[in-house]
């Protein structure tokens, strides 16, 4: 079964590059920052399962999930 998801984008609007395909600690951390629990390295970029379009940009994800009131 195909799981929906997205490639998250960093502060520069680029996908996160990764070198270790499949299980990837860096990608898992990236996906947590973007508000989802799991992700992995696919085609040399981090892919996050169940990542919604609204949270693809790290700026949007930070606004949606950070508890810090700065910028609100």
Curated annotation (Swiss-Prot):
It holds the Pfam family Toxin_3. Residues 3-67 form the LCN-type CS-alpha/beta domain. Disulfide bonds join 18-41, 27-46, 31-48. Keywords: Disulfide bond, Ion channel impairing toxin, Neurotoxin, Secreted, Toxin, Voltage-gated sodium channel impairing toxin. The keyword Secreted applies. One of its GO terms (molecular function) is toxin activity. Expressed by the venom gland. Coiled coil: none annotated. The keyword Zinc-finger does not apply. It is found in: Secreted. One of its GO terms (cellular component) is extracellular region. Belongs to the long (3 C-C) scorpion toxin superfamily. Sodium channel inhibitor family. Beta subfamily. Has the structural arrangement of an alpha-helix connected to antiparallel beta-sheets by disulfide bonds (CS-alpha/beta). Binds to sodium channels (Nav) and affects the channel activation process. This is Toxin Acra II-1. It comes from Androctonus crassicauda.
